[in-house]
């Protein structure tokens, strides 16, 4: 094929209940893009019924598409290889193979999740965004680092779209339920307290869903339950995006996926980005949900940069992780120019995290820092006050508690509950993140020993990242706002998973060396074998579908 000319690719999307066919050129012009959604008659999506829908609908859409772009003009066939429902993926792959063989054109299978990111970049001004991808089957925070799109954060159980749809079905709303939840939420005026579960840059939604169902069953107004469900879940999503932003130091945030159509979620993220002084992007609604154009576009990007597939390589991968894809279409040179920005920290602060502003000062005669958990404009007042106060008190308590376990921590000088401030001793040193970037890994085994001591004492940090250790003559642990007491092996396993993913996201080139040293140190904890085994089980449950 002559790749010097403008190529035309047809894309087939069929990972769940939406059937999409799109045609796009290599200069980004969308020639055709149409999606038809399967609406189940009663309950949720049955995989076989969704697959039957694809088999019928692909034929109709293909006929319509080829009236716009003649079949002889198609240069490339692309399809969603995964992740998704097995039966749906198989029908999609079969359709793409059949067309590829009949017109004798190359075929490319692409990652569904990354397709959302790349079509979003095409349709906005985003260059290097941190992406929140939210849909019926996926909830991920993605960032490009080191030739891959890394999963920085995600749901530990169900996806946000699934959460909203399950709640809607419980309340006898039509499918897709998220639209109706949003509609009812607009008329809600009472905030009902529901579980709020953030663990580092991950969230859990199953407990929230169960609690919301119980509130509905207890005769709370449906408008108020929908309002509270949205405020809670979307605040959690916005928070983990903000945490990932602080961790990766990106200067752009992009929202993609079917749930990106929700106006309240867009509003929350927009407010957060303004507060963090970064740019926010959302593609047009047509390109937020599943569609064929995004599949075709990623197919073109991969093909033009050397990707080739044999028919034997086109077997669907239902658990196709974003970070399994080698990104061959982004040049590292693109990230060495003035177009790629980093998040800017205000001059009067020495640090600005996802939760707090950090300033340096003097307390009596001692060097100190003040950590102020600032108001979050994206959260409603009732929820924001509750979270900020609870985490301020919790952090002070745990900083004192870990000292009893022989772990170094800053000394607390003052707690201002009203303004959600903690003043503590200033630690001279560097955060672990900086030490690792310099290539100094000598302290990493100590991190594992420290975590083992915490777990031995029944303390789970819940936000272990390389930004929450300060290395000087000794290693100090900070930022216990999400901490809790727990003897559950799974809680300790998730603690390590949070740290593992934070290391992988920005220290990917040193991951093996860093992680092996940490685990070597963690083996000083008597229950290390049980925790490490549990880690494997939890990682298998991670949602990529």
Swiss-Prot record:
It is an enzyme of class 2 (transferase). L-threonylcarbamoyladenylate binds at residues 133-137, 165, 178, 182, 262. ATP binds at residues 350-358, 371. GO terms for biological process: tRNA threonylcarbamoyladenosine modification. Residues 344-545 form the Protein kinase domain. GO terms for cellular component: cytoplasm; EKC/KEOPS complex. It comes from the Archaea. Its EC number is 2.3.1.234, 2.7.11.1. Keywords: Acyltransferase, ATP-binding, Cytoplasm, Iron, Kinase, Metal-binding, Multifunctional enzyme, Nucleotide-binding, Serine/threonine-protein kinase, Transferase, tRNA processing. Its cofactor is Fe(2+). Gene3D superfamilies: 3.30.420.40, Phosphorylase Kinase, domain 1, Transferase(Phosphotransferase) domain 1. The active site is at 463 (proton acceptor). It catalyses: L-seryl-[protein] + ATP = O-phospho-L-seryl-[protein] + ADP + H(+); L-threonyl-[protein] + ATP = O-phospho-L-threonyl-[protein] + ADP + H(+); L-threonylcarbamoyladenylate + adenosine(37) in tRNA = N(6)-L-threonylcarbamoyladenosine(37) in tRNA + AMP + H(+). Fe cation binds at residues 112, 116, 133, 290. In the N-terminal section; belongs to the KAE1 / TsaD family. In the C-terminal section; belongs to the protein kinase superfamily. Tyr protein kinase family. BUD32 subfamily. Required for the formation of a threonylcarbamoyl group on adenosine at position 37 (t(6)A37) in tRNAs that read codons beginning with adenine. Is a component of the KEOPS complex that is probably involved in the transfer of the threonylcarbamoyl moiety of threonylcarbamoyl-AMP (TC-AMP) to the N6 group of A37. The Kae1 domain likely plays a direct catalytic role in this reaction. The Bud32 domain probably displays kinase activity that regulates Kae1 function. Component of the KEOPS complex that consists of Kae1, Bud32, Cgi121 and Pcc1; the whole complex dimerizes. PANTHER family: TRNA N6-ADENOSINE THREONYLCARBAMOYLTRANSFERASE. This is Probable bifunctional tRNA threonylcarbamoyladenosine biosynthesis protein.
């Amino acid at each position: 094929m002559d790749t010097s000319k403008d190529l035309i690719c047809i894309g087939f999307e069929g990972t769940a209940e939406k059937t999409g066919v799109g045609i796009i050129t290599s200069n980004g012009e969308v020639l055709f893009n149409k999606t038809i959604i399967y609406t189940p008659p009663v309950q949720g999506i049955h995989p076989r019924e969704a697959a039957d829908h694809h088999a019928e609908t692909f034929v109709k859409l293909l006929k319509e598409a080829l009236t716009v772009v003649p079949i002889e003009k198609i240069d490339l066939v692309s399809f969603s290889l995964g992740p998704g429902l097995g039966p749906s993926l198989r029908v999609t792959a079969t359709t793409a193979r059949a067309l590829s063989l009949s017109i004798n054109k190359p075929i490319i299978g692409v990652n569904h999740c990354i397709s959302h990111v790349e079509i979003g970049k095409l349709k906005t001004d985003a260059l290097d965004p941190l992406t929140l991808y939210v849909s019926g089957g996926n909830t991920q925070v993605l960032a490009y680092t080191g030739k891959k799109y890394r999963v920085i954060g995600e749901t530990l159980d169900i996806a946000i779209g699934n959460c909203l749809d399950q709640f809607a079905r419980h309340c006898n709303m039509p499918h897709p339920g998220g639209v109706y939840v949003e509609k009812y939420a607009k008329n809600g005026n009472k905030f009902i307290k529901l579980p709020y579960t953030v663990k580092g840059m991950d969230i859990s939604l199953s407990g929230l869903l169960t609690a919301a169902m119980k509130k509905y069953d207890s005769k709370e107004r449906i408008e108020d339950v929908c309002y509270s469900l949205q405020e809670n879940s979307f605040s959690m999503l916005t928070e983990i995006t903000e945490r990932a932003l602080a961790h990766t130091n990106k200067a752009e945030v992009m929202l993609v996926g079917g749930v990106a159509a929700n106006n309240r979620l867009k509003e929350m993220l927009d407010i957060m980005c303004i507060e963090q002084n970064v740019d926010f992007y959302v593609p047009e609604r047509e390109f937020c949900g599943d569609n064929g154009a995004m599949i075709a576009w990623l197919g073109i990007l991969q093909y033009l940069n050397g990707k080739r597939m044999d028919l034997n390589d086109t077997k669907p991968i239902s658990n196709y992780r974003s970070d399994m894809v080698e990104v061959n279409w982004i040049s590292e040179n693109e990230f060495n120019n003035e177009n790629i920005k980093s998040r800017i920290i205000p001059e009067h602060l020495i640090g600005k995290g996802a939760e707090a502003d950090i300033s340096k000062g003097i307390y009596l005669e001692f060097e100190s820092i003040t950590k102020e958990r600032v108001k979050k404009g994206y959260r409603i007042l009732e929820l924001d006050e509750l979270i900020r106060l609870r985490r301020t008190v919790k952090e002070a308590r745990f900083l004192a508690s870990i000292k009893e376990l022989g772990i170094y921590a800053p000394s607390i000088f003052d707690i201002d509950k009203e303004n959600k401030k903690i003043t503590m001793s200033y630690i001279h040193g560097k955060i672990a993140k900086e030490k690792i970037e310099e290539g100094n890994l000598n302290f990493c085994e100590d991190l594992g020993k420290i975590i083992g001591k915490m777990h031995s004492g029944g303390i789970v940090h819940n936000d272990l990242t390389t930004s929450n250790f300060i290395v000087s003559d000794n290693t100090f642990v900070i930022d216990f706002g999400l901490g809790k007491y727990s003897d559950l092996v799974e809680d300790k396993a998730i603690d390590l998973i949070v740290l593992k993913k934070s290391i992988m996201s920005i220290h990917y080139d040193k991951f093996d060396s860093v992680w092996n040293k940490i685990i070597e140190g963690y083996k000083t904890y008597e229950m290390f074998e049980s925790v490490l085994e549990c880690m494997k089980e939890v990682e298998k449950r991670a949602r990529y579908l």
